[in-house]
Amino acid sequence: MAKPIPKIGSRRNGRISSRKSARKIPKGVIHVQASFNNTIVTVTDVRGRVVSWASAGTCGFRGTKRGTPFAAQTAAGNAIRTVVEQGMQRAEVMIKGPGLGRDAALRAIRRSGILLSFVRDVTPMPHNGCRPPKKRRV
């Protein structure tokens, strides 16, 4: 009979206090992923560990409203509000995707008071890789 493998750590008893409030982050990276259907804003520290995130869907927007610039602005504001309280002053911004929320999210980040060291477009561009899907006929 095989021995049961003991659990090393479970999620329930792992954390006693909130880790997010304990960390002080002076510098971070803000990732904005803007698709036509949604905008996701993730704030990480310089090592890549996620500190805060928000999307248009988590901000209460549903359906086609998630792809709007206003939804992206709200998502960026919600994600950044928590890290400003933790003491973030400088950030780099990585924008990915062709969505409508790119500029609106960047505008909300600029208004938050965080100094931006650079803004980089990291949208993946194929060097003629995969064949695209066929054109829609409506």
Swiss-Prot record:
Span list, region Disordered: 1-24
Keywords of the record: Chloroplast, Plastid, Ribonucleoprotein, Ribosomal protein, RNA-binding, rRNA-binding
GO cellular component, one term: ribonucleoprotein complex
Alphabetical list of PROSITE patterns matching this protein: RIBOSOMAL_S11
Membrane-spanning segments: none
Coiled coil: none
SUPFAM superfamilies in the record: Translational machinery components
Localization: Plastid, Chloroplast
UniProt GO BP: translation
UniProt feature, compositional bias: Basic residues: 9-24
Molecular function as annotated in GO: rRNA binding; structural constituent of ribosome
Family assignment from sequence similarity: Belongs to the universal ribosomal protein uS11 family.
Protein name, per record: Small ribosomal subunit protein uS11c
Name of encoding gene: rps11
